[in-house]
A protein has these predicted regions:
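A secondary-structure capping/hinge motif
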Residues: 79-81
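Short hydrophobic/aromatic patch on the recognition helix
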Residues: 66-75
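Secondary-structure edge/capping motif, primarily at the C-terminal ends of alpha-helices
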Residues: 121, 163, 187-192
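Basic, helix-initiating cap at the start of DNA-binding domains
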Residues: 1-50, 54-66, 83, 92
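C-terminal peripheral helix-coil segments that are non-catalytic and often amphipathic
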Residues: 1-22, 158, 193-219
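Hydrophobic alpha-helical connector segments
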Residues: 91-131
Length: 219
């Protein structure tokens, strides 16, 4: 997947010391990440050139200059080659909820995350539009994306419940997670016709925020 995930630059809350910078990855971790990126880049290039179903695993391994064994260590199934940032995407999504500034609602935090992600996609890898077309036109990738979407929804719903003091199986948490993840797609569809994707995204999350306030305000 083209890199569209923004890196967090949120300041520390007023009066709080800045969070310590994470330790830089070691040589082994850097090499592993570079290999994974090389495999994913080679796979996406071949998929966009020839189509997902017409490219074999061995061809991808050869293009990335790795063995098929190494490829499968990083990507256990072929579909995962397209969604190589799945874990990072989920981690950033959960962090948007758990690390939001004091006083910011969960829907507002998810709105800001969605807006940052949209800006990064608009100014990021030019292959992103082609990537979306590849997923939409390939049944195996659509199915994998749907399963990934459901996993992200469940993980986000758990984080929302924990942050809001609600039961883990509260349907309101699942509903918020569902619509928060669906909002960018709905806003983009609106924007494709009317040309105001950002405004549509803000309005959608404003609606979610208003509804969420009625839930959290209950005794």
């Amino acid at each position: 997947m083209p890199d569209t995930e923004p890196r967090s630059t949120a300041p520390a809350p007023d009066g709080a010391p800045p969070a310590p910078a994470p330790a830089p990855p070691g040589r082994r971790e850097r090499k592993k990440a570079a290999t994974r990126r090389a495999i994913a880049d080679a796979a996406l290039r071949l998929f966009l050139e020839r189509g997902y179903d017409d490219v074999g695993i061995r061809e991808i391994a050869e293009a990335a200059d790795v063995s098929t064994t190494t490829l499968f260590k990083h990507f256990p199934v072929k579909e995962a080659l397209v969604f190589d940032e799945e874990a990072d995407l989920e981690a950033h999504l959960i962090a948007a909820v758990r690390e939001r500034p004091p006083g910011r609602s969960v829907p507002a935090a998810l709105r800001e995350h969605a807006l940052r992600h949209r800006r990064a996609a608009d100014g990021g890898d030019p292959r992103f539009t082609a990537f979306l077309g590849l997923v939409d036109s390939t049944p195996a990738l659509r199915d994998y994306h749907q399963a990934m979407w459901l996993r992200h929804t469940a993980a986000l719903a758990r984080a929302v419940a924990e942050e809001s003091g609600l039961a883990a199986d509260d349907p309101a948490c699942t509903a918020l997670a569902h619509f928060a993840l669906e909002a960018p797609r709905a806003a983009q569809a609106h924007g494709d016709v009317h040309g105001d994707t950002r405004e549509a995204l803000i309005r959608t999350f404003d609606l979610l925020d208003a509804g969420w306030q009625t839930i959290t305000a209950r005794p």
